[in-house]
Swiss-Prot record:
Keywords: Cell membrane, Disulfide bond, G-protein coupled receptor, Glycoprotein, Membrane, Olfaction, Receptor, Sensory transduction, Transducer, Transmembrane, Transmembrane helix. Glycans are attached at N5. It is found in: Cell membrane. This is Olfactory receptor 1f45. The chain crosses the membrane at residues 26-50, 58-79, 101-120, 140-158, 197-219, 237-260, 273-292. The keyword Transmembrane helix applies. Odorant receptor.
Length: 313
């Protein structure tokens, strides 16, 4: 059997963000704090929406799904980083690496699809308010979420199967803090043109189509707001989209910076900085972005916290 095949590499080494011990300790602390904030913040959002009947609407249904996906997204990478630091190890098995890559891609795709679905919800609410309840039915909302899961898993399974066929020879060091597609393609000693072609074609379609839907939705929303006679009324309508727009810019800005450049132009430091933004920082910020200027959400969160920590008389 040839020595230059897939079985010659049984594990990869995740080099992480830094090799300096002091920086590693600081990064461990930062990642731990951000991960705890991500889990706590998003679970509070889910709990608040589930316990407050006023929030049982399509917008908050999609938001609770986004919060669930964000917890899963962050949990795909950060716990492994923390565990490796505690154990003093950099290793991840070949199968573990592909598994991590698969779930990272699935949850990333789900973020993408849910942001598009949420923009459609805002489009219907602002542009067709009288037909909102008849258009955004519970059946449609469930169908949109389930359909997103199906498409995300099918898309990611295709890319993982293409990745699994590659051969990895002597070099098994990944200059990243998790298993990502671009570093793995660079390590492969096989022809990766098909993988790169699929990322830039099929992968781009899956990523760009929801983004185009978001743009179209906001063009219609902007036109509808500009037609409102009262500036105050128009601003109030558009302000409900502000949180969603902030998350869209944060998510797509970092993803495009990493995944839609030629592989030869990728710089490890820049890619990792962008990866920290979309895989760690964005899931942490989403609960704050969606709740800071939302009075209904803040009231629901106060209610949940009051139930958990009742004030002493």
């Amino acid at each position: 059997m040839s020595s230059t095949n897939q079985s010659s590499v049984t594990e990869f080494l995740l080099l992480g963000l830094s090799r300096q011990p002091q920086q590693q300790q600081l990064l461990f602390l930062l990642f731990l704090i951000m991960y705890l904030a991500t889990v706590l913040g998003n679970l509070l959002i889910i709990l608040a929406i589930g316990t407050d009947s006023r929030l049982h609407t399509p917008m908050y249904f999609f938001l609770s799904n986004l919060s669930f996906v964000d917890v899963c997204f962050s949990s795909t990478t950060v716990p492994k980083v923390l565990a490796n630091h505690i154990l003093g190890s950099q290793a991840i098995s070949f199968s573990g690496c592909l598994t991590q890559l698969y779930f990272l891609a699935v949850f990333g795709n789900m973020d993408n699809f849910l942001l598009a679905v949420m923009s459609y919800d805002r489009f219907v609410a602002i542009c067709h308010p009288l037909h909102y309840t008849t258009k955004m039915t519970r059946q449609l909302c469930v169908l949109l979420v389930v359909g997103s899961w199906v498409v995300a898993n099918m898309n990611c399974l295709l890319h993982i199967l293409l990745m699994a066929r590659l051969s990895f020879c002597a070099d098994n060091m990944i200059p990243h803090f998790f298993c990502d597609g671009t570093p793995l393609l660079k390590l492969s000693c096989s022809d990766t043109h098909l993988n790169e072609l699929m990322i830039l074609t099929e992968g781009a379609v899956v990523m760009v189509t929801p983004f185009v839907c978001i743009l179209i939705s906001y063009i219609h929303i902007t036109c509808a707001v500009l037609r409102v006679s009262s500036p105050r009324g128009g601003w109030k309508s558009f302000s409900t989209c502000g949180s969603h727009l902030a998350v869209v810019c944060l998510f797509y800005g970092t993803v495009i910076a990493v995944y839609f450049n030629p592989s030869s132009s990728h710089l490890a430091g820049r890619d990792m900085a962008a990866a920290v933004m979309y895989a760690v920082v964005t899931p942490m910020l989403n609960p704050f972005i969606y709740s800071l200027r939302n009075s209904d959400m803040k009231a629901a969160l106060r209610k949940v916290l009051a139930m958990r920590f009742p004030s002493k008389q």
